Amino acid sequence: MSIDLEAIQEMWEKDSKIDRDNLHEESLNIPSLHAKYFELYNTIFLLRKKAEQQRKNIRHERYEYFSGKSDPEVYVENPFPKKIRDKDTMQKYLDADEKLSNTSLKIDYYDTMLVYLESILKVIQNRTYQIKNAIEFMRFNSGLG
């Protein structure tokens, strides 16, 4: 199963709706909703950790490459005529490196997903109060409040 932000948004679009005619069922459904989105949160969190480690590995690999310290075979496949020694220049090359920036973008994407899932989990935690308020409002409207 491929998890992306759009899929999570579509799931939440369906799950966020509260059926006013079945508030008791909606109330009982809160724990399973929480479990569903908390599992997604944990999965994305671990994927982010993995991507963070990949970024560190790629950064080290690219640092070695740009400084001329990689295995000679690497330069046969992908020649790089310079040996960068200056720290500022090295940082510029690392910032512009496609492999490294792709991994950084992946981490940023995971961060966006995590923020979205955190907001969903907060809404789910408050759902009990929303349902309670809806019930009290119905009682009030029917003259029982």
Regions found by a protein language model. Give the residues of each.
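Charge-rich amphipathic alpha-helical interaction elements
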Residues: 1-145
